[in-house]
Amino acid sequence: MSKSPVAIIILDGFGKRAETVGNAVAQANKPNFDRYWADFPHGELKAAGLDVGLPEGQMGNSEVGHTNIGAGRIVYQSLTRIDKAIEEGEFQENKALNNAFTHTKENNSDLHLFGLLSDGGVHSHINHLVALLETAKDKGVKNVYIHAFLDGRDVAPQSSLEYLETLQKAISDLNYGAIATVSGRFYAMDRDKRWERVEKAYKAIVSAEGEKFEDPIELVKASYANDKNDEFVVPAIITKDGKPVATVKDNDAVIFFNFRPDRAIQLSNAFTDKEWDHFDRGADHPKNIKFVTMTLYNPSIDAEVAFEPIEMKNVIGEVLSNEGLSQLRIAETEKYPHVTFFMNGGRNEEFPGENRILINSPKVETYDLQPEMSAYEVTDALVEDIKNDKHDAIILNFANPDMVGHSGMLEPTIKAIEAVDENLGRVVDLILEKGGSAIIFADHGNSETMSTPEGKPHTAHTTVPVPVIVTKKGVTLREGGRLADVAPTMLDLLGVKKPAEMTGESLIQK
């Protein structure tokens, strides 16, 4: 039977900004997007700050965006939850955190804090690290050591010195704690099974393998002199009197303070997985450690969780499933967790009638080297699926504008957007041919802002609104939409009643 599918098409990191300087979206040749914009109802969506459950003025990101899209409601994010817990005193009494503190006291051992050192608010926040230091001191933990992962991606490429200085000031004010290792997130926070990267971070933390520096500031400056920005700082060891400040040893406790799971899973597994076979962890692999993660990274990780997920009922996948509609989730590796786990409200398993296609992202050092990434392969697989009338609903993500946008390089990002546009045309024209419709939009901004006002590369997400197109003639879109309104719009196009839990509203004016 022929199907007329309704698709959610996410152009990841494709924001809307009037200024064309440093704007890859505006400068790209994108005839298909421009044609849909001209021919169909369009507008913009809010995708940052309070509109997606983040603090006011906080840029959106893919995890937050896809969670809000799938939920059809504003979902208060981990960043906001943890901030609130610190403010209201719940953080200090958190059971999992206190279990880590107790473990060190009972074993006369050390506490180690792992995480991304910035105020980017995408994976972590430096305020949470400072709160952990204050709380550990209050609770009588004797020694605490920080293993700092440098950002340079959700914040400026060379901004780690200011975060290290903020951290050193907190250490000095509290007269408590020390930085033990420093690593660029490229190594410590890989999510693409590049195990040789994770191994470098792991061995720095456990075996003090790596270059030695007495001062983290000098370490970063040496890295810059070597043309390696924060993200790419090779894992290195901080020493005192010629000896490593600290390594993770038997009976220690670890708190991984990243709240976003995807880039914290592999390193967590390196410490906790009993069946590990990705690299030789060596004789130093610590035994009997208490491992605590800020949020649930993956149910398979042997760790206590400080902030358990809030279960959500009636996300888009569940509603489609309950209606007996078939649905496809499709993306390349970089954004596959977003169209599955995050879109399903933090649920790994499929709903009945939900199918998934994962296309591998290319194995390149950085995506500016291959701006098209796997967009053509994703599209080939999807076109085949649509031609064969497989699914009633489709959720697709094109990763390129975001992943190449993070390079801070304008030309490759323009190429990335042009590749996406070509593939967007193939998908949407086929859907229209089948009598279906698509909601084309982005989860957050990035590629529309590739340079700072000073003309330096801009690699982070932004707070700008994102464009939205609904490829259905004869309807009008209301203004003031946000990401939470996308799922209700899909249901509207499918003729399905929106459940009470979805507080978002269809973008189509009645």
Swiss-Prot record:
Q: Which GO terms describe its biological process?
A: carbohydrate metabolic process; glucose catabolic process; glycolytic process
The answer to whether UniProt assigns keyword Cell wall biogenesis/degradation to this entry is no
Which reaction is this enzyme known to catalyze?
A: (2R)-2-phosphoglycerate = (2R)-3-phosphoglycerate
Please give the organism. Answer: Listeria monocytogenes serovar 1/2a (strain ATCC BAA-679 / EGD-e)
Per the entry, what this protein does is: Catalyzes the interconversion of 2-phosphoglycerate and 3-phosphoglycerate.
Q: What is this protein called?
A: 2,3-bisphosphoglycerate-independent phosphoglycerate mutase
Residues reported in the UniProt entry to bind substrate: H123, R153, D154, R185, R191, R260, P261, D262, R263, K335
Query: What family classification does the UniProt entry report for this protein?
Result: Belongs to the BPG-independent phosphoglycerate mutase family.
Q: Name its pathway.
A: Carbohydrate degradation; glycolysis; pyruvate from D-glyceraldehyde 3-phosphate: step 3/5
Residues the record lists as binding Mn(2+) 1: D402, H406, H461
